[in-house]
Design a protein with these regions (language model features):
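Catalytic strand-loop segment that frames the active site of acyl-thioester-processing enzymes
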Residues: 1-37
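HotDog/MaoC-like acyl-thioester-processing domains
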Residues: 2-4, 67-68, 79-141
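A broad, structural micro-motif
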Residues: 19, 53-55, 101
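Solvent-exposed, charged/polar functional surfaces in cytosolic regulatory/catalytic domains
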Residues: 34, 61, 130, 134
Length: 141
């Protein structure tokens, strides 16, 4: 699990200073990018190696309101992995109170620059092994 610290910006909120629901998906992406940086495979490196990882599905369950100027910890875990697909799960918690604010999940495949699904174990075994080393049990279990 990797923990990504995120301060809420005023522009992400409505007139009641409540974070708009669409921003959580961005927070998941930021946390996932941080996760990849932590394992020495930032998106820039993957792009250089002609690999992309498009989102196949995304879900978010909102538990508690997030407001400006809250500070969040987005916990991201790789919970499922095979040669062509990866699943990440997220827990969004208040950095001070540790109150759970949201949970989420994203599923991704691996494609080459032509957009064709590829086996990451074959096309980039070092990246695949780095992911295998991070594989954890589901947050929901």
């Amino acid at each position: 699990m990797k923990s990504y610290l995120r301060k809420i910006n005023y522009y992400e909120t409505d007139q009641m200073k409540i974070v708009h629901h669409s921003n959580y998906i961005r927070y998941f992406e930021e946390a996932r990018c941080y996760f990849l940086e932590c394992i020495n495979y930032p998106y820039a490196k993957l792009e250089e190696e002609k690999i992309a990882s498009p989102v196949l599905s995304v879900s978010c369950e909102y538990k508690r309101v997030v407001k400006y100027p809250d500070e969040l910890i987005i916990e991201v875990m790789l919970t499922e992995l095979n040669k062509v697909k990866a699943t990440f799960e997220y827990r969004v918690v208040d950095s001070k109170t540790k109150e759970l604010k949201a949970i989420g999940k994203t599923e991704h495949c691996f494609v080459n620059e032509a957009g064709k699904v590829v086996s990451i174990a074959k096309t980039n075994p070092s990246f695949y092994n780095a992911l295998v080393n991070e594989l954890e049990f589901s947050i929901e279990k």
